[in-house]
Amino acid sequence: DLFQAELYLISPLTEPGRFLKKEYFLTYQQRDIERQILKKIRADRTGYFWFTGLPGTGKTLLLYDIAMKLSGRQRVCMIHCGEAGKEWKVLHERLRRVEYLAEDSVQTGAEIRIEAYSAILVDEAHLLSPNTLEILLEIGKTRPVIFSSNCEDMISPEELDLGAIKLLGEQPGIQTFH
């Protein structure tokens, strides 16, 4: 029997059980990105990090794997943009040190104490409004913020808010990975 990579390239959102049992692997590139981000976070305890890729290339898996590692000792916040709502409820129930928020919760400040988290992770960051991004960039001055998004050329015109993407790319000191 040949090895079938597609059996191990999973989405934590659609297959939370397999994710929680660690029935997946990261590619060499994903492991390298994760290593660089975690090394910098351990050294500086702050910073902006942004990785992009084509849809289906494991960005969400990488982001969740980083969240799992960072949440070993401290609470982290995972912000979901878009329609990921119901899927992450299973993960939310199981991962006690990972708090899940929808983007609109950040905008309204609805009972959120962002300072309670040691790191902020943002999935589908290309869907962020410029207002929410500004709030997250301010938070990033005192703790790490990790953004994951689709490549610019893969974002539909309805989803693309160039203001937010441009603002993110212009952040001094942001580490980007493609």
Where are these regions (language model features)?
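Interdomain "pre-motor" coupling segment immediately N-terminal to P-loop NTPase/helicase cores
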Residues: 1-12
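Conserved helicase motor core of SF1/SF2 NTP-dependent helicases
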Residues: 16-28, 34-57, 61-119, 124-178
